[in-house]
């Protein structure tokens, strides 16, 4: 979890804030939880600016952008789109449509749209599409490497149009990412049939009575944002062995307990680095890489060490693909490996170093990146370092 790229990417993130408490539509609930994408991008070493801080700037000269599009032959003036005229006589513009007002169209169909899109209405007014691409073009001209738009399902369709329009301006899909967040799908356990059944959407206030905010966030993020996220309200976040969030939190709490017991018994000595607060991504990355210096006595320990060392790469991939589910699944793998290892670890320096690394990694990723709470512990300080191991 270091600054993973040699060159820091400058990113503009547009994720309209939606207050969960006033959102009355289930599709917006999951969307409202995607604000953690900013954490994800920053922890992977990017410089992130929210679109709201840029949207108040004066819109540049739309006419100038419009003329640039025309000079690049990405637009044309006609009565109908190319998709319609293909089935008409070649001279239809000079004959049937000769007295019709001509309209400017952008060649978005060349980039995956199902038809070309209008840029200017017959009365001369510019369309919202042209206004939008002008604004985003302006942001790129200010030195941004990437623009990421995250929107609820109501924007389905416009994502294809806008992405294609930006490609007409020469920007790739990697530079301009438009992500539609799919909704949650609720399920509940039906006792009479002993089966899981889908249930109708319920209001956010009612949902939060059944599922904690932490569980709601976890199950919203552990599935790709572009896929519907199933959530079983009967078990989500409940203290059961089947719940993945509970297992992860249990692994963290077990790490805390073992470290605290070892310190109280004088087996190990830990000290705070000072300064408090979060550890920097660079510091954690260095600690994780140091695990490669040890020889592990058990397969579980070796697997856990490898999983922890892979965190910087997973974090980088998760940020690049706007895929927090990759981070969630990696955390699940860490917890699944940790739990059996924690029950059988022997008292030696490398195991306690691994224990501390696992605890700190879970803390930083779950709480500081994914904004999901952890169980209370009397040993919560994440800013610790291993000082001494006593063999007495």
Question: Where do the language-model regions lie?
Answer:
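Non-catalytic interaction-recognition regions
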Residues: 1-392
């Amino acid at each position: 979890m270091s600054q993973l790229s040699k060159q820091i990417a400058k990113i503009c993130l547009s994720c309209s804030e939606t207050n969960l408490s006033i959102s009355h539509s289930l599709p917006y609930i999951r969307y409202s939880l995607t604000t953690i994408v900013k954490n994800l991008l920053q922890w992977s070493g990017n410089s992130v600016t929210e679109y709201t801080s840029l949207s108040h700037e004066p819109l540049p000269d739309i006419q100038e952008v419009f003329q640039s599009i025309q000079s690049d032959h990405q637009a044309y003036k006609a009565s109908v789109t190319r998709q319609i005229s293909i089935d008409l006589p070649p001279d239809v513009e000079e004959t049937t449509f000769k007295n019709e007002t001509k309209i400017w169209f952008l060649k978005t169909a060349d980039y995956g749209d199902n038809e070309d899109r209008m840029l200017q209405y017959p009365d001369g007014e510019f369309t919202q599409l042209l206004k939008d691409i002008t604004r985003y073009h302006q942001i790129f001209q200010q030195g941004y490497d990437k623009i990421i738009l995250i929107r609820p399902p109501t924007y389905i369709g416009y994502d294809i149009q806008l992405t294609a329009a930006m490609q007409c301006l020469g920007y790739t899909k990697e530079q301009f990412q438009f992500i539609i967040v799919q909704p949650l799908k609720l399920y509940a356990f039906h006792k009479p049939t002993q089966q899981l059944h889908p249930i109708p959407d319920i209001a956010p206030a009612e949902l939060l009575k059944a599922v904690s905010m932490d569980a709601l966030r976890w199950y919203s993020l552990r599935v790709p944002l572009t896929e519907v996220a199933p959530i079983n309200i009967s078990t989500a976040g409940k203290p059961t062995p089947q719940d993945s969030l509970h297992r992860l939190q249990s692994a963290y709490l077990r790490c805390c307990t073992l470290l605290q017991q070892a310190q109280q018994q004088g087996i190990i000595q830990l000290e705070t680095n000072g300064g408090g607060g979060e550890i920097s991504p660079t510091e954690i990355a260095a600690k994780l890489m140091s695990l490669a210096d040890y020889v592990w006595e058990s397969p579980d320990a070796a697997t856990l060490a490898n999983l922890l060392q892979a965190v910087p790469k997973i974090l980088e991939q998760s940020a690049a693909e706007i895929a927090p589910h990759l981070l969630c699944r990696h955390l699940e793998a860490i917890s699944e490996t940790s739990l059996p290892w924690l029950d059988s670890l022997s008292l030696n320096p490398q195991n306690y170093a691994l224990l501390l690394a696992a605890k700190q990694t879970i803390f930083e990723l779950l709480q500081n990146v994914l904004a999901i709470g952890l169980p209370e512990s009397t040993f919560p300080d994440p800013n610790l370092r291993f000082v001494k191991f006593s063999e007495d």
